[in-house]
Curated annotation (Swiss-Prot):
Catalytic activity: N(6)-carboxybiotinyl-L-lysyl-[protein] + acetyl-CoA = N(6)-biotinyl-L-lysyl-[protein] + malonyl-CoA
Sequence segments annotated as region (Acetyl-coenzyme A carboxylase carboxyl transferase subunit alpha): 272-582
Protein name listed in UniProt: Acetyl-coenzyme A carboxylase carboxyl transferase subunits beta/alpha
Pathway(s) of this molecule: Lipid metabolism; malonyl-CoA biosynthesis; malonyl-CoA from acetyl-CoA: step 1/1
Family, similarity comment: In the N-terminal section; belongs to the AccD/PCCB family.
GO cellular component, one term: acetyl-CoA carboxylase complex
Region Acetyl-coenzyme A carboxylase carboxyl transferase subunit beta, residue ranges: 1-271
Keyword Metal-binding attached: yes
Source organism per UniProt: Frankia alni (strain DSM 45986 / CECT 9034 / ACN14a)
Biased composition (Basic and acidic residues): 594-609
One Pfam family here: ACCA
Keyword Nucleotide-binding in record: yes
UniProt function note: Component of the acetyl coenzyme A carboxylase (ACC) complex. Biotin carboxylase (BC) catalyzes the carboxylation of biotin on its carrier protein (BCCP) and then the CO(2) group is transferred by the transcarboxylase to acetyl-CoA to form malonyl-CoA.
GO-annotated biological processes: fatty acid biosynthetic process; malonyl-CoA biosynthetic process
Length: 609
Protein backbone atom coordinates (compact mmCIF):
# COMPACT_ATOMS: atom_id res chain seq x y z
CA UNK A 1 0.00 0.00 0.00
CA UNK A 2 1.12 3.61 -0.51
CA UNK A 3 0.07 7.01 0.79
CA UNK A 4 -2.33 8.78 -1.55
CA UNK A 5 -0.71 11.63 -3.47
CA UNK A 6 -2.58 14.91 -3.40
CA UNK A 7 -0.55 17.20 -5.67
CA UNK A 8 2.58 17.31 -7.77
CA UNK A 9 5.27 18.69 -5.49
CA UNK A 10 7.63 20.83 -7.50
CA UNK A 11 10.12 20.84 -4.66
CA UNK A 12 10.39 17.03 -4.81
CA UNK A 13 11.11 17.07 -8.53
CA UNK A 14 13.63 19.86 -8.00
CA UNK A 15 15.37 17.97 -5.21
CA UNK A 16 15.65 14.64 -6.98
CA UNK A 17 16.23 15.85 -10.49
CA UNK A 18 14.29 13.00 -12.06
CA UNK A 19 12.41 13.24 -15.32
CA UNK A 20 8.85 14.55 -15.01
CA UNK A 21 6.92 11.31 -14.81
CA UNK A 22 4.02 12.72 -12.84
CA UNK A 23 4.68 11.00 -9.53
CA UNK A 24 4.62 12.94 -6.29
CA UNK A 25 7.05 12.72 -3.42
CA UNK A 26 4.52 10.92 -1.24
CA UNK A 27 3.53 8.54 -4.00
CA UNK A 28 7.14 7.83 -4.84
CA UNK A 29 8.43 6.73 -1.47
CA UNK A 30 6.28 6.72 1.69
CA UNK A 31 8.74 6.02 4.49
CA UNK A 32 8.04 4.92 8.05
CA UNK A 33 7.63 8.09 10.13
CA UNK A 34 9.44 8.09 13.47
CA UNK A 35 7.68 9.25 16.61
CA UNK A 36 9.93 11.90 18.23
CA UNK A 37 12.23 10.48 20.92
CA UNK A 38 10.88 6.97 20.44
CA UNK A 39 11.80 3.56 19.03
CA UNK A 40 8.41 3.43 17.32
CA UNK A 41 7.66 4.14 13.67
CA UNK A 42 4.45 4.82 11.78
CA UNK A 43 3.72 2.45 8.86
CA UNK A 44 3.76 4.22 5.51
CA UNK A 45 0.89 2.01 4.36
CA UNK A 46 -1.69 1.79 7.12
CA UNK A 47 -0.33 4.21 9.72
CA UNK A 48 -0.08 1.63 12.49
CA UNK A 49 2.65 1.86 15.13
CA UNK A 50 5.70 -0.32 14.42
CA UNK A 51 8.41 -1.18 16.94
CA UNK A 52 11.63 -0.37 15.11
CA UNK A 53 13.67 -3.44 16.06
CA UNK A 54 10.87 -5.88 15.31
CA UNK A 55 10.17 -4.06 12.04
CA UNK A 56 13.83 -4.50 11.06
CA UNK A 57 13.80 -8.21 12.00
CA UNK A 58 10.77 -8.73 9.76
CA UNK A 59 12.53 -7.27 6.74
CA UNK A 60 10.88 -3.85 7.04
CA UNK A 61 7.47 -5.30 6.25
CA UNK A 62 4.38 -4.24 8.21
CA UNK A 63 2.79 -7.23 9.95
CA UNK A 64 -0.67 -5.63 9.72
CA UNK A 65 -0.92 -4.53 6.08
CA UNK A 66 2.16 -6.20 4.49
CA UNK A 67 3.45 -2.85 3.31
CA UNK A 68 7.06 -3.23 2.11
CA UNK A 69 9.09 -0.24 3.25
CA UNK A 70 12.01 1.09 1.20
CA UNK A 71 15.42 -0.38 1.95
CA UNK A 72 18.92 1.00 1.77
CA UNK A 73 21.54 -0.70 -0.37
CA UNK A 74 23.12 -2.33 2.68
CA UNK A 75 19.77 -3.53 4.02
CA UNK A 76 18.97 -5.04 0.64
CA UNK A 77 22.30 -6.86 0.40
CA UNK A 78 21.95 -8.17 3.95
CA UNK A 79 18.50 -9.51 3.05
CA UNK A 80 19.45 -11.23 -0.19
CA UNK A 81 23.05 -12.41 0.00
CA UNK A 82 24.66 -15.14 2.05
CA UNK A 83 26.37 -13.84 5.18
CA UNK A 84 29.83 -12.38 4.54
CA UNK A 85 29.65 -13.15 0.80
CA UNK A 86 29.33 -9.57 -0.50
CA UNK A 87 32.43 -8.19 -2.20
CA UNK A 88 32.13 -4.59 -3.50
CA UNK A 89 33.01 -3.92 -7.12
CA UNK A 90 34.89 -0.66 -7.57
CA UNK A 91 33.74 1.67 -10.33
CA UNK A 92 36.19 4.42 -11.36
CA UNK A 93 35.01 7.93 -10.61
CA UNK A 94 33.64 9.84 -13.57
CA UNK A 95 32.62 13.47 -14.06
CA UNK A 96 29.43 13.79 -12.05
CA UNK A 97 28.35 17.08 -13.65
CA UNK A 98 28.90 16.84 -17.42
CA UNK A 99 26.73 19.90 -18.16
CA UNK A 100 27.91 22.07 -15.24
CA UNK A 101 24.22 22.32 -14.51
CA UNK A 102 22.58 24.90 -12.26
CA UNK A 103 18.90 25.42 -11.58
CA UNK A 104 17.98 27.01 -8.25
CA UNK A 105 21.16 25.39 -6.93
CA UNK A 106 24.28 24.00 -8.58
CA UNK A 107 24.00 20.29 -9.35
CA UNK A 108 27.34 19.68 -7.65
CA UNK A 109 25.85 21.00 -4.41
CA UNK A 110 22.93 18.59 -4.72
CA UNK A 111 25.34 15.70 -5.23
CA UNK A 112 27.37 16.78 -2.20
CA UNK A 113 24.27 16.95 -0.01
CA UNK A 114 22.98 13.58 -1.24
CA UNK A 115 26.31 11.97 -0.39
CA UNK A 116 26.33 13.55 3.04
CA UNK A 117 22.76 12.51 3.89
CA UNK A 118 22.99 8.92 2.60
CA UNK A 119 26.63 7.99 3.07
CA UNK A 120 26.63 6.77 -0.54
CA UNK A 121 28.75 7.83 -3.49
CA UNK A 122 25.84 7.42 -5.89
CA UNK A 123 22.35 5.94 -6.31
CA UNK A 124 23.62 2.46 -7.22
CA UNK A 125 26.27 0.00 -6.10
CA UNK A 126 27.61 -3.28 -7.48
CA UNK A 127 28.81 -6.31 -5.52
CA UNK A 128 29.77 -9.92 -6.05
CA UNK A 129 28.12 -12.41 -3.72
CA UNK A 130 26.27 -15.68 -3.36
CA UNK A 131 22.65 -16.64 -2.72
CA UNK A 132 22.37 -20.06 -1.12
CA UNK A 133 25.83 -20.77 -2.49
CA UNK A 134 24.98 -19.70 -6.05
CA UNK A 135 27.36 -16.99 -7.34
CA UNK A 136 25.74 -13.78 -8.55
CA UNK A 137 26.64 -10.21 -9.49
CA UNK A 138 24.21 -7.74 -7.91
CA UNK A 139 23.50 -4.13 -8.85
CA UNK A 140 21.33 -2.38 -6.24
CA UNK A 141 19.72 1.05 -6.38
CA UNK A 142 18.85 3.35 -3.47
CA UNK A 143 16.01 5.81 -3.87
CA UNK A 144 17.31 8.07 -1.11
CA UNK A 145 20.07 9.31 -3.41
CA UNK A 146 18.36 11.86 -5.69
CA UNK A 147 15.36 9.62 -6.20
CA UNK A 148 17.45 6.74 -7.52
CA UNK A 149 17.76 8.71 -10.73
CA UNK A 150 19.70 7.34 -13.68
CA UNK A 151 22.75 9.40 -14.54
CA UNK A 152 26.15 8.67 -16.01
CA UNK A 153 27.56 7.13 -12.84
CA UNK A 154 24.55 4.88 -12.22
CA UNK A 155 24.70 3.79 -15.85
CA UNK A 156 28.40 3.02 -15.46
CA UNK A 157 27.82 1.04 -12.25
CA UNK A 158 25.22 -1.11 -13.98
CA UNK A 159 27.30 -1.57 -17.12
CA UNK A 160 30.40 -2.53 -15.14
CA UNK A 161 28.30 -5.07 -13.26
CA UNK A 162 26.97 -6.54 -16.50
CA UNK A 163 30.49 -6.72 -17.95
CA UNK A 164 31.72 -8.48 -14.82
CA UNK A 165 28.87 -10.99 -15.09
CA UNK A 166 29.85 -11.51 -18.73
CA UNK A 167 33.52 -12.12 -17.95
CA UNK A 168 32.80 -14.50 -15.09
CA UNK A 169 29.73 -16.11 -16.72
CA UNK A 170 27.75 -15.37 -13.58
CA UNK A 171 24.04 -14.47 -13.39
CA UNK A 172 23.21 -10.78 -12.96
CA UNK A 173 20.61 -9.60 -10.44
CA UNK A 174 19.41 -5.99 -10.55
CA UNK A 175 17.37 -4.40 -7.74
CA UNK A 176 15.68 -1.23 -8.99
CA UNK A 177 14.27 1.81 -7.20
CA UNK A 178 14.13 4.93 -9.34
CA UNK A 179 12.02 7.84 -10.46
CA UNK A 180 13.67 7.95 -13.88
CA UNK A 181 16.52 9.66 -15.71
CA UNK A 182 18.45 12.47 -14.01
CA UNK A 183 17.50 15.78 -15.64
CA UNK A 184 20.62 17.63 -14.50
CA UNK A 185 22.72 15.42 -16.79
CA UNK A 186 20.57 16.06 -19.85
CA UNK A 187 21.11 13.88 -22.92
CA UNK A 188 24.02 12.11 -21.21
CA UNK A 189 21.50 10.66 -18.75
CA UNK A 190 19.23 9.70 -21.63
CA UNK A 191 22.05 7.79 -23.31
CA UNK A 192 22.36 5.56 -20.23
CA UNK A 193 19.15 3.83 -21.30
CA UNK A 194 20.86 2.69 -24.50
CA UNK A 195 24.14 1.91 -22.78
CA UNK A 196 22.57 -0.35 -20.13
CA UNK A 197 20.23 -2.04 -22.60
CA UNK A 198 23.19 -2.84 -24.83
CA UNK A 199 24.99 -4.44 -21.88
CA UNK A 200 22.04 -6.75 -21.26
CA UNK A 201 22.01 -7.67 -24.93
CA UNK A 202 25.58 -8.92 -24.61
CA UNK A 203 24.54 -11.14 -21.69
CA UNK A 204 21.75 -12.52 -23.87
CA UNK A 205 24.26 -13.40 -26.58
CA UNK A 206 26.47 -15.12 -24.02
CA UNK A 207 23.65 -17.17 -22.51
CA UNK A 208 23.86 -15.65 -19.02
CA UNK A 209 20.75 -15.43 -16.83
CA UNK A 210 19.54 -11.97 -15.85
CA UNK A 211 17.00 -11.30 -13.10
CA UNK A 212 15.36 -8.01 -12.19
CA UNK A 213 13.81 -7.33 -8.78
CA UNK A 214 11.36 -4.45 -9.02
CA UNK A 215 10.91 -2.43 -5.83
CA UNK A 216 8.74 0.61 -5.26
CA UNK A 217 9.03 2.80 -7.28
CA UNK A 218 10.61 2.00 -10.65
CA UNK A 219 9.72 4.55 -13.33
CA UNK A 220 10.84 6.39 -16.42
CA UNK A 221 14.21 5.67 -18.00
CA UNK A 222 15.08 2.82 -15.63
CA UNK A 223 11.74 1.10 -16.26
CA UNK A 224 12.22 1.56 -20.00
CA UNK A 225 15.69 0.01 -20.05
CA UNK A 226 17.47 -2.47 -17.80
CA UNK A 227 14.65 -2.99 -15.28
CA UNK A 228 12.39 -4.70 -17.81
CA UNK A 229 14.91 -6.37 -20.12
CA UNK A 230 15.86 -9.17 -17.72
CA UNK A 231 15.00 -12.80 -18.45
CA UNK A 232 12.97 -13.02 -15.25
CA UNK A 233 11.22 -10.08 -13.59
CA UNK A 234 10.26 -10.41 -9.92
CA UNK A 235 8.34 -7.67 -8.10
CA UNK A 236 7.80 -6.98 -4.45
CA UNK A 237 4.12 -6.71 -3.41
CA UNK A 238 2.69 -3.31 -4.26
CA UNK A 239 5.78 -2.15 -6.15
CA UNK A 240 4.95 0.25 -8.97
CA UNK A 241 6.54 0.14 -12.39
CA UNK A 242 5.86 2.28 -15.43
CA UNK A 243 7.18 4.74 -17.97
CA UNK A 244 4.87 7.68 -17.32
CA UNK A 245 3.45 8.32 -13.86
CA UNK A 246 -0.17 7.91 -12.92
CA UNK A 247 -0.95 11.64 -12.70
CA UNK A 248 0.55 12.43 -16.11
CA UNK A 249 -1.53 9.67 -17.68
CA UNK A 250 -4.74 10.78 -15.96
CA UNK A 251 -4.20 14.39 -16.99
CA UNK A 252 -3.44 13.34 -20.57
CA UNK A 253 -6.33 10.95 -21.20
CA UNK A 254 -8.80 12.57 -18.77
CA UNK A 255 -9.76 9.24 -17.22
CA UNK A 256 -9.68 7.84 -13.71
CA UNK A 257 -7.28 4.91 -13.62
CA UNK A 258 -7.80 1.67 -11.66
CA UNK A 259 -6.77 1.79 -8.00
CA UNK A 260 -4.06 -0.84 -8.57
CA UNK A 261 -2.76 0.75 -11.79
CA UNK A 262 0.97 0.11 -12.37
CA UNK A 263 1.29 -1.98 -9.19
CA UNK A 264 2.95 -5.38 -9.17
CA UNK A 265 -0.45 -7.04 -8.96
CA UNK A 266 -1.71 -5.11 -12.01
CA UNK A 267 1.46 -5.89 -13.93
CA UNK A 268 1.27 -9.62 -13.14
CA UNK A 269 -2.22 -9.78 -14.64
CA UNK A 270 -1.06 -7.82 -17.68
CA UNK A 271 1.92 -10.03 -18.45
CA UNK A 272 4.77 -7.72 -17.44
CA UNK A 273 6.22 -9.50 -14.40
CA UNK A 274 6.85 -13.19 -13.80
CA UNK A 275 6.03 -13.38 -10.12
CA UNK A 276 5.35 -11.33 -7.02
CA UNK A 277 7.54 -12.32 -4.11
CA UNK A 278 7.16 -11.14 -0.50
CA UNK A 279 10.52 -10.34 1.08
CA UNK A 280 10.52 -13.40 3.31
CA UNK A 281 10.44 -15.58 0.16
CA UNK A 282 12.87 -13.63 -2.00
CA UNK A 283 16.06 -15.51 -1.14
CA UNK A 284 14.44 -18.90 -1.73
CA UNK A 285 12.89 -17.80 -5.03
CA UNK A 286 16.16 -16.33 -6.28
CA UNK A 287 18.14 -19.39 -5.18
CA UNK A 288 15.81 -21.68 -7.16
CA UNK A 289 16.20 -19.57 -10.28
CA UNK A 290 19.97 -19.37 -9.98
CA UNK A 291 20.26 -23.13 -9.45
CA UNK A 292 18.55 -23.89 -12.78
CA UNK A 293 20.18 -21.12 -14.79
CA UNK A 294 22.41 -23.41 -16.82
CA UNK A 295 23.07 -27.06 -17.61
CA UNK A 296 26.36 -28.66 -16.64
CA UNK A 297 28.29 -30.51 -19.32
CA UNK A 298 27.60 -33.77 -17.50
CA UNK A 299 23.93 -32.99 -17.01
CA UNK A 300 22.38 -36.20 -18.35
CA UNK A 301 19.45 -37.74 -16.45
CA UNK A 302 20.11 -40.99 -14.66
CA UNK A 303 18.17 -44.01 -15.88
CA UNK A 304 16.37 -45.40 -12.86
CA UNK A 305 14.58 -48.11 -14.79
CA UNK A 306 14.48 -49.84 -18.16
CA UNK A 307 13.69 -47.33 -20.96
CA UNK A 308 12.12 -50.07 -23.07
CA UNK A 309 9.50 -50.57 -20.36
CA UNK A 310 8.83 -46.84 -19.92
CA UNK A 311 7.76 -46.26 -23.54
CA UNK A 312 6.12 -48.56 -26.10
CA UNK A 313 7.46 -47.99 -29.61
CA UNK A 314 5.83 -50.96 -31.40
CA UNK A 315 2.10 -50.46 -32.12
CA UNK A 316 1.58 -54.22 -32.14
CA UNK A 317 2.38 -54.24 -28.43
CA UNK A 318 -0.63 -52.02 -27.76
CA UNK A 319 -4.10 -53.48 -27.44
CA UNK A 320 -6.72 -52.35 -29.93
CA UNK A 321 -9.35 -50.15 -28.33
CA UNK A 322 -12.40 -48.19 -29.34
CA UNK A 323 -11.36 -44.67 -30.44
CA UNK A 324 -14.36 -43.05 -28.78
CA UNK A 325 -13.47 -44.69 -25.49
CA UNK A 326 -10.03 -43.11 -25.81
CA UNK A 327 -11.64 -39.70 -26.35
CA UNK A 328 -13.77 -40.10 -23.24
CA UNK A 329 -10.83 -41.33 -21.18
CA UNK A 330 -8.64 -38.42 -22.32
CA UNK A 331 -11.24 -35.92 -21.10
CA UNK A 332 -11.70 -37.25 -17.58
CA UNK A 333 -11.28 -34.41 -15.07
CA UNK A 334 -9.24 -36.51 -12.70
CA UNK A 335 -6.30 -36.79 -15.09
CA UNK A 336 -3.18 -35.00 -13.82
CA UNK A 337 -2.59 -31.49 -15.12
CA UNK A 338 0.70 -29.85 -16.04
CA UNK A 339 1.00 -28.33 -12.57
CA UNK A 340 0.23 -31.71 -11.01
CA UNK A 341 3.02 -33.33 -13.01
CA UNK A 342 5.41 -30.46 -12.25
CA UNK A 343 4.82 -30.95 -8.53
CA UNK A 344 5.39 -34.72 -8.79
CA UNK A 345 8.35 -35.01 -11.14
CA UNK A 346 10.32 -31.76 -10.88
CA UNK A 347 12.53 -30.25 -8.22
CA UNK A 348 12.59 -26.50 -7.58
CA UNK A 349 9.95 -25.61 -10.18
CA UNK A 350 9.43 -21.86 -10.57
CA UNK A 351 6.48 -20.76 -12.69
CA UNK A 352 7.11 -17.84 -15.05
CA UNK A 353 4.19 -15.71 -16.18
CA UNK A 354 3.35 -13.19 -18.83
CA UNK A 355 3.96 -12.51 -22.51
CA UNK A 356 5.74 -9.19 -21.73
CA UNK A 357 3.18 -7.48 -23.94
CA UNK A 358 -0.31 -7.37 -22.51
CA UNK A 359 -1.46 -10.43 -20.60
CA UNK A 360 -0.80 -13.68 -18.82
CA UNK A 361 -2.77 -16.70 -20.03
CA UNK A 362 -3.74 -19.07 -17.18
CA UNK A 363 -4.50 -21.83 -19.70
CA UNK A 364 -0.79 -22.25 -20.36
CA UNK A 365 1.81 -22.59 -17.62
CA UNK A 366 5.56 -22.35 -18.06
CA UNK A 367 8.61 -22.33 -15.87
CA UNK A 368 12.03 -23.65 -14.94
CA UNK A 369 12.86 -26.62 -12.75
CA UNK A 370 15.05 -29.70 -12.52
CA UNK A 371 14.29 -33.24 -13.67
CA UNK A 372 16.51 -35.72 -11.86
CA UNK A 373 18.91 -32.85 -11.20
CA UNK A 374 18.98 -31.64 -14.82
CA UNK A 375 17.69 -28.05 -15.34
CA UNK A 376 14.77 -27.96 -17.79
CA UNK A 377 12.14 -25.58 -19.11
CA UNK A 378 8.61 -26.96 -18.86
CA UNK A 379 5.56 -25.67 -20.73
CA UNK A 380 2.08 -27.08 -20.74
CA UNK A 381 -1.59 -26.43 -21.13
CA UNK A 382 -3.55 -26.38 -17.89
CA UNK A 383 -7.17 -27.46 -17.48
CA UNK A 384 -8.16 -28.16 -13.89
CA UNK A 385 -10.20 -30.51 -11.73
CA UNK A 386 -13.18 -28.34 -10.73
CA UNK A 387 -15.69 -26.17 -12.56
CA UNK A 388 -14.21 -22.99 -11.09
CA UNK A 389 -10.67 -23.96 -12.04
CA UNK A 390 -11.73 -24.96 -15.54
CA UNK A 391 -13.35 -21.56 -16.04
CA UNK A 392 -10.31 -19.74 -14.65
CA UNK A 393 -7.99 -21.81 -16.87
CA UNK A 394 -10.19 -21.20 -19.92
CA UNK A 395 -10.76 -24.97 -20.13
CA UNK A 396 -7.13 -25.42 -21.08
CA UNK A 397 -7.46 -23.45 -24.34
CA UNK A 398 -4.58 -20.97 -24.67
CA UNK A 399 -4.99 -17.43 -25.94
CA UNK A 400 -2.33 -15.69 -28.07
CA UNK A 401 -0.77 -14.46 -24.82
CA UNK A 402 -0.32 -18.09 -23.79
CA UNK A 403 1.52 -19.04 -26.96
CA UNK A 404 3.66 -15.91 -26.75
CA UNK A 405 4.49 -16.72 -23.15
CA UNK A 406 5.54 -20.21 -24.21
CA UNK A 407 7.71 -18.72 -26.97
CA UNK A 408 9.36 -16.38 -24.48
CA UNK A 409 10.24 -19.26 -22.16
CA UNK A 410 11.47 -21.41 -25.06
CA UNK A 411 13.78 -18.58 -26.14
CA UNK A 412 15.03 -18.37 -22.57
CA UNK A 413 15.68 -22.13 -22.63
CA UNK A 414 17.62 -21.72 -25.87
CA UNK A 415 19.65 -18.90 -24.36
CA UNK A 416 20.54 -20.95 -21.27
CA UNK A 417 20.99 -24.24 -23.13
CA UNK A 418 18.16 -25.99 -21.28
CA UNK A 419 16.07 -28.81 -22.79
CA UNK A 420 12.37 -28.07 -23.26
CA UNK A 421 9.57 -30.37 -22.10
CA UNK A 422 5.99 -29.69 -23.21
CA UNK A 423 2.89 -31.33 -21.75
CA UNK A 424 -0.25 -31.08 -23.85
CA UNK A 425 -3.87 -31.50 -22.81
CA UNK A 426 -6.09 -29.10 -24.71
CA UNK A 427 -9.15 -29.18 -26.93
CA UNK A 428 -7.35 -26.54 -29.00
CA UNK A 429 -6.45 -22.88 -29.12
CA UNK A 430 -9.11 -20.58 -27.68
CA UNK A 431 -11.63 -19.53 -30.36
CA UNK A 432 -12.88 -16.06 -29.50
CA UNK A 433 -13.16 -12.51 -30.78
CA UNK A 434 -10.34 -11.23 -28.57
CA UNK A 435 -8.11 -14.12 -29.59
CA UNK A 436 -8.58 -13.24 -33.25
CA UNK A 437 -8.02 -9.54 -32.55
CA UNK A 438 -4.74 -10.51 -30.89
CA UNK A 439 -3.68 -12.66 -33.87
CA UNK A 440 -4.20 -16.21 -32.62
CA UNK A 441 -3.14 -17.68 -35.95
CA UNK A 442 0.06 -15.64 -35.98
CA UNK A 443 0.94 -16.69 -32.42
CA UNK A 444 0.56 -20.38 -33.33
CA UNK A 445 2.51 -20.01 -36.57
CA UNK A 446 5.36 -18.21 -34.84
CA UNK A 447 5.61 -20.99 -32.27
CA UNK A 448 5.91 -23.59 -35.02
CA UNK A 449 8.68 -21.66 -36.75
CA UNK A 450 10.48 -21.10 -33.45
CA UNK A 451 10.35 -24.75 -32.43
CA UNK A 452 11.58 -25.89 -35.84
CA UNK A 453 14.93 -24.24 -35.17
CA UNK A 454 15.19 -24.35 -31.40
CA UNK A 455 18.83 -25.31 -30.66
CA UNK A 456 18.03 -27.42 -27.58
CA UNK A 457 16.32 -30.81 -27.14
CA UNK A 458 12.52 -30.68 -27.19
CA UNK A 459 10.33 -33.49 -25.85
CA UNK A 460 6.54 -33.22 -26.19
CA UNK A 461 4.03 -35.43 -24.40
CA UNK A 462 0.29 -35.48 -25.16
CA UNK A 463 -1.09 -36.27 -21.72
CA UNK A 464 -4.80 -35.94 -22.52
CA UNK A 465 -6.39 -34.19 -25.48
CA UNK A 466 -4.19 -33.06 -28.36
CA UNK A 467 -6.50 -30.72 -30.22
CA UNK A 468 -5.49 -29.42 -33.63
CA UNK A 469 -3.04 -26.56 -34.20
CA UNK A 470 -3.42 -25.41 -30.63
CA UNK A 471 -1.75 -28.65 -29.53
CA UNK A 472 0.77 -28.80 -32.38
CA UNK A 473 2.02 -25.33 -31.39
CA UNK A 474 3.64 -27.08 -28.40
CA UNK A 475 4.41 -30.41 -30.09
CA UNK A 476 6.98 -29.57 -32.78
CA UNK A 477 9.58 -31.68 -31.00
CA UNK A 478 12.51 -34.05 -31.37
CA UNK A 479 10.57 -36.73 -29.54
CA UNK A 480 6.76 -36.80 -29.45
CA UNK A 481 5.17 -39.15 -26.93
CA UNK A 482 1.63 -39.67 -25.72
CA UNK A 483 -0.05 -41.35 -22.80
CA UNK A 484 -1.94 -44.54 -23.58
CA UNK A 485 -5.37 -42.96 -23.00
CA UNK A 486 -4.56 -39.69 -24.77
CA UNK A 487 -5.84 -38.61 -28.20
CA UNK A 488 -4.39 -36.34 -30.89
CA UNK A 489 -6.31 -35.06 -33.90
CA UNK A 490 -6.73 -32.36 -36.51
CA UNK A 491 -10.23 -31.62 -35.12
CA UNK A 492 -12.46 -32.86 -32.34
CA UNK A 493 -14.56 -35.91 -33.14
CA UNK A 494 -17.72 -33.87 -32.56
CA UNK A 495 -16.53 -31.11 -34.89
CA UNK A 496 -15.65 -33.57 -37.62
CA UNK A 497 -19.01 -35.32 -37.26
CA UNK A 498 -20.91 -32.04 -37.47
CA UNK A 499 -19.05 -30.90 -40.59
CA UNK A 500 -18.69 -34.11 -42.59
CA UNK A 501 -21.50 -36.32 -41.27
CA UNK A 502 -23.82 -33.36 -40.68
CA UNK A 503 -24.66 -35.07 -37.41
CA UNK A 504 -22.86 -34.51 -34.06
CA UNK A 505 -24.13 -37.89 -32.91
CA UNK A 506 -21.71 -39.48 -35.37
CA UNK A 507 -18.77 -38.45 -33.16
CA UNK A 508 -17.80 -42.07 -32.27
CA UNK A 509 -17.68 -42.93 -35.97
CA UNK A 510 -15.64 -39.80 -36.71
CA UNK A 511 -13.19 -40.62 -33.90
CA UNK A 512 -12.52 -44.04 -35.41
CA UNK A 513 -12.13 -42.59 -38.90
CA UNK A 514 -9.70 -39.92 -37.67
CA UNK A 515 -7.61 -42.57 -35.89
CA UNK A 516 -7.14 -40.40 -32.83
CA UNK A 517 -5.98 -43.12 -30.42
CA UNK A 518 -2.42 -43.92 -29.32
CA UNK A 519 -2.07 -47.21 -31.20
CA UNK A 520 -3.05 -45.73 -34.55
CA UNK A 521 -0.97 -42.59 -34.09
CA UNK A 522 2.09 -44.68 -33.25
CA UNK A 523 1.47 -46.79 -36.34
CA UNK A 524 1.21 -43.62 -38.47
CA UNK A 525 4.47 -42.29 -37.03
CA UNK A 526 2.80 -39.16 -35.66
CA UNK A 527 4.09 -40.09 -32.22
CA UNK A 528 7.35 -41.86 -31.43
CA UNK A 529 6.20 -43.76 -28.39
CA UNK A 530 3.35 -44.42 -25.99
CA UNK A 531 3.59 -44.22 -22.21
CA UNK A 532 1.49 -47.00 -20.63
CA UNK A 533 -0.91 -45.88 -17.91
CA UNK A 534 -1.66 -47.72 -14.65
CA UNK A 535 -4.78 -49.87 -14.41
CA UNK A 536 -7.80 -47.60 -14.45
CA UNK A 537 -5.94 -44.80 -16.23
CA UNK A 538 -3.98 -41.74 -15.15
CA UNK A 539 -6.88 -40.40 -13.10
CA UNK A 540 -6.98 -43.60 -11.03
CA UNK A 541 -3.27 -43.39 -10.14
CA UNK A 542 -1.76 -39.93 -10.77
CA UNK A 543 1.42 -40.71 -8.85
CA UNK A 544 1.99 -43.92 -10.79
CA UNK A 545 1.40 -42.11 -14.06
CA UNK A 546 3.83 -39.36 -13.05
CA UNK A 547 6.49 -41.96 -12.27
CA UNK A 548 6.09 -43.45 -15.76
CA UNK A 549 6.19 -40.00 -17.33
CA UNK A 550 9.38 -39.18 -15.43
CA UNK A 551 11.04 -42.35 -16.66
CA UNK A 552 9.97 -41.69 -20.26
CA UNK A 553 11.36 -38.15 -20.10
CA UNK A 554 14.62 -39.40 -18.62
CA UNK A 555 15.04 -41.83 -21.47
CA UNK A 556 14.26 -39.23 -24.14
CA UNK A 557 16.64 -36.66 -22.69
CA UNK A 558 19.39 -39.24 -22.24
CA UNK A 559 19.16 -39.87 -26.01
CA UNK A 560 18.92 -36.21 -27.05
CA UNK A 561 21.22 -34.26 -24.75
CA UNK A 562 24.48 -35.65 -26.21
CA UNK A 563 23.52 -34.43 -29.71
CA UNK A 564 24.94 -31.16 -31.00
CA UNK A 565 22.73 -28.36 -32.24
CA UNK A 566 23.08 -29.17 -35.94
CA UNK A 567 22.10 -32.80 -35.42
CA UNK A 568 19.14 -31.87 -33.26
CA UNK A 569 17.69 -29.33 -35.65
CA UNK A 570 18.42 -31.44 -38.76
CA UNK A 571 16.73 -34.52 -37.30
CA UNK A 572 13.76 -32.54 -36.02
CA UNK A 573 13.15 -30.92 -39.39
CA UNK A 574 13.54 -34.25 -41.18
CA UNK A 575 11.00 -35.82 -38.82
CA UNK A 576 8.31 -33.35 -39.79
CA UNK A 577 9.43 -33.04 -43.43
CA UNK A 578 8.50 -36.67 -44.16
CA UNK A 579 4.79 -36.47 -43.22
CA UNK A 580 2.58 -37.03 -46.24
CA UNK A 581 5.25 -38.29 -48.66
CA UNK A 582 5.69 -41.88 -49.81
CA UNK A 583 9.48 -41.65 -49.77
CA UNK A 584 11.06 -39.57 -47.01
CA UNK A 585 12.83 -36.49 -48.36
CA UNK A 586 16.55 -36.10 -47.64
CA UNK A 587 17.33 -34.16 -44.50
CA UNK A 588 18.43 -30.57 -44.99
CA UNK A 589 20.99 -29.26 -42.54
CA UNK A 590 20.58 -25.79 -41.03
CA UNK A 591 22.51 -22.97 -42.67
CA UNK A 592 26.18 -23.09 -41.77
CA UNK A 593 27.32 -20.78 -38.99
CA UNK A 594 30.32 -20.39 -36.74
CA UNK A 595 28.62 -22.33 -33.97
CA UNK A 596 26.87 -24.92 -36.12
CA UNK A 597 28.89 -27.72 -34.56
CA UNK A 598 28.77 -26.55 -30.97
CA UNK A 599 27.46 -29.01 -28.39
CA UNK A 600 24.25 -28.43 -26.47
CA UNK A 601 26.19 -26.95 -23.59
CA UNK A 602 27.22 -24.07 -25.85
CA UNK A 603 24.82 -21.16 -25.83
CA UNK A 604 23.09 -19.94 -28.97
CA UNK A 605 19.96 -17.94 -29.53
CA UNK A 606 20.47 -17.12 -33.17
CA UNK A 607 18.49 -20.16 -34.29
CA UNK A 608 15.47 -18.92 -32.34
CA UNK A 609 15.19 -15.58 -34.05
Amino acid sequence: MTLEATAIEATAIEATGIEATGITATAIEPTPRRSPGSSWLLCGGCGTMLYERRFAREGRVCADCSWHAPMTIQQRLDLLLDADSARPVDVPAIDGDPLEFTDTRPYRDRLRDARASTGLDEAAACVRGTIDGNPVVVVVMDFRFLGGSLGATVGEVFTRGAELALRERTPLLTVTASGGARMQEGAIALMQMAKTSQALGQLDEAGILTVSLITDPTFGGVAASFATLADVIIAEPGARLGFAGRRVIEQTIRQTLPEDFQTAEFLLTHGVVDLISPRRELRANLARLLSVSSRRADGIPRQAGRPDRAVVTDPEQLARRDAWESVRAARRLGRPTTLDYAAMILEDFTELRGDRMSADCPALVAGLGRLDGVPVAVLGTQKGHTADELRYRNFGMPTPAGYRKSARVMRLAAKLGLPVITLIDTAGAYPGVEAEEQAQAVAIAENLRLMAGLPVPVVAVVTGEGGSGGALALAFADRVLMCANAVYSVISAEGCAAILWKNPAAAPTAAAALRVDARELLRLGVVDGVIPEPDGGADADPAGTAARLREALRGALADLLPLDQMNLVTRRRARFRQFGVATPAPATAPAASDDAHESQTDRSVEATR
